[in-house]
Design a protein with these regions (language model features):
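Short glycine-enriched nucleophile-adjacent loop
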Residues: 177-184
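Active-site catalytic motif of lipid deacylating hydrolases and related acyltransferases
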Residues: 73-163
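Flexible, membrane-associating and regulatory peripheral segments of lipid-active enzymes
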Residues: 17-99, 103, 108-109
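Bacterial Sec-dependent N-terminal signal peptides
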Residues: 1-22
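Short, active-site-adjacent cap segments at secondary-structure transitions
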Residues: 126, 173-174
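Gly/Ala-rich beta-loop-alpha elbow adjacent to hydrolase catalytic centers
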Residues: 168, 172
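Structural motif
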Residues: 68, 163-165
Length: 186
């Protein structure tokens, strides 16, 4: 009996051990380069750049759609070992996730509602929400600054007075809440 308790204690210690990853506080010198939304490559999706996979969801001609959909995607930067507060938009792994997971399985739901606009942005790491005082707040504000700039470019370059649907999920909703406040609240 005592031997079994000893094994249980050893197993409990083994299973409770985990690697500790020390996250540095947010520092401005480590901020990825800001995107220029006048350049099409800084958008995951524009109506002129729909992928063949995305076009499969179309049931109406894109020119017949009466509204635009500005979609801000959810948190994808979740790996514990990734110590960056914000992912650069040129990160190919992040781009792959945006295009092949989020756009195809979430944003595509809006493809028959309006022309789809999805900007890449310097997304904050998931830990930002639990470490607001250590740098999370700064990381989220940086991400929002990209979403806001993308929306400003969208309004000036693409909107042409069309109705707008603002759609989002997870971290994207954190940012669109402020977007609605900054652009639509009186």
């Amino acid at each position: 009996m005592i031997k079994n308790i000893g094994y249980f204690i050893v197993l409990a210690f083994l299973f409770s051990c985990k690697a500790v990853i020390k996250v540095q506080e947010f520092q401005n010198k480590e901020v990825p380069e800001a995107p220029n939304y006048l350049n099409e490559e800084n958008w995951a999706v524009l109506p002129s750049t729909y992928s063949l996979d995305l076009k499969e969801f179309e049931t109406k001609s894109i020119d017949s759609l009466k509204a635009d959909v500005f979609y801000v995607y959810p948190t994808l930067n979740t790996a514990k070992e990734d110590l960056r507060w914000n992912a650069p938009i040129a990160d190919l792994e992040q781009q792959y996730k945006v295009l092949n997971k989020v756009v195809l399985f979430q944003a595509s739901a809006f493809i028959t509602s309006g022309k789809l606009y999805v900007p890449y942005y310097r997304q904050a790491h998931l830990r930002s929400y639990s470490m607001l005082e250590k740098g999370g707040k700064k990381a989220l504000l940086l991400a929002y600054s990209d979403v806001k700039k993308a929306f400003e470019v969208y309004l000036k370059k693409y909107n042409n007075g069309r109705p707008i649907i603002i759609a989002s999920h997870s971290q994207g909703s954190t940012h669109t809440k402020f977007l609605l406040r900054d652009f639509f609240d009186d």
